[in-house]
């Protein structure tokens, strides 16, 4: 089980990403726009750098909904491999069954 502080840190990052997503997209659009002048690009880059580091989407890490484990988390289920196997064996995940051939 992950520490509560780690789970809260990830939730805080998700909130920051949502809060600054539009600003970040606007600055990136200016930077990638062919018609932007060098001065506009520089200003956009500086403003982008001044945004909080944790507001970047790449800083958010998926965690297991049950245990908070950060590795081996299946996106489709939101569970880590251990809990997914446990729930699948108990029959709690509809449509999922153990493969045998």
From Swiss-Prot:
Name of the protein in its database record: Small ribosomal subunit protein uS14
Endpoints of the signal sequence: none
InterPro entries named among the record's database cross-references: Ribosomal_uS14 (IPR001209), Ribosomal_uS14_bac/plastid (IPR023036), Ribosomal_uS14_CS (IPR018271)
Known function: Binds 16S rRNA, required for the assembly of 30S particles and may also be responsible for determining the conformation of the 16S rRNA at the A site.
Encoding gene per record: rpsN
UniProt lineage: Bacteria, Pseudomonadati, Pseudomonadota, Gammaproteobacteria, Thiotrichales
A single GO cellular-component term on record: cytoplasm
GO function terms (MF aspect): rRNA binding; structural constituent of ribosome
GTP-binding is among the record's keywords: no
Biological processes annotated in GO: translation
Record-stated family: Belongs to the universal ribosomal protein uS14 family.
Alphabetically ordered keywords of this record: Ribonucleoprotein, Ribosomal protein, RNA-binding, rRNA-binding
